């Protein structure tokens, strides 16, 4: 697969507003379990980054063009008990974003709309 076979995604989620829990969450992500990374790669994720601002998480990832977050993230938790354990463990730190329209709520992470891409304008030149 070349870079044309991948698509970009962005999702958002909040952390529980507790400084100790946030620090613990960050520590876990410095040492993500090997099985979690392997499971993410096996469902077609090429790149993934999570950013934090206060209690707000922003996740950017690139996945194969036919990736479906609703289906493939479910597969990820089913692939290995460790991936499922990780997902359940992270839930103690996380909470859904409370102030977004109901139609934009995801299963857990909420999908974000792309409103700007520099590549749109590079193609015009």
UniProtKB/Swiss-Prot annotation:
Pfam families: rhaM (PF05336). GO terms for molecular function: racemase and epimerase activity, acting on carbohydrates and derivatives. Gene3D superfamilies: 3.30.70.100. SUPFAM superfamilies: Dimeric alpha+beta barrel. InterPro entries: Carb_Metab_Mutarotase, Dimeric_a/b-barrel, Rham/fucose_mutarotase. Belongs to the UPF0734 family. This is UPF0734 protein DDB_G0273871/DDB_G0273177. The lineage of its organism: Eukaryota, Amoebozoa, Evosea, Eumycetozoa, Dictyostelia.
């Amino acid at each position: 697969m070349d870079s044309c076979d991948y698509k970009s995604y962005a999702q958002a989620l909040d952390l529980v507003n507790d400084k100790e829990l946030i620090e613990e969450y960050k520590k876990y992500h410095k040492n993500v379990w090997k099985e979690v990374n392997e499971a993410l790669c096996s469902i077609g994720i090429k790149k993934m980054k999570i950013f934090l601002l206060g209690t707000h998480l922003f996740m950017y990832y690139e996945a194969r063009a036919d990736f479906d977050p609703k289906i493939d993230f479910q597969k990820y938790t089913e692939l290995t008990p460790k991936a499922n354990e990780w997902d359940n463990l992270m839930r103690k730190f996380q909470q859904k974003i409370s102030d977004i329209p109901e139609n934009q709520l995801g299963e857990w992470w909420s999908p974000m709309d792309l409103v700007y891409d520099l590549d749109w304008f590079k193609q015009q030149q």
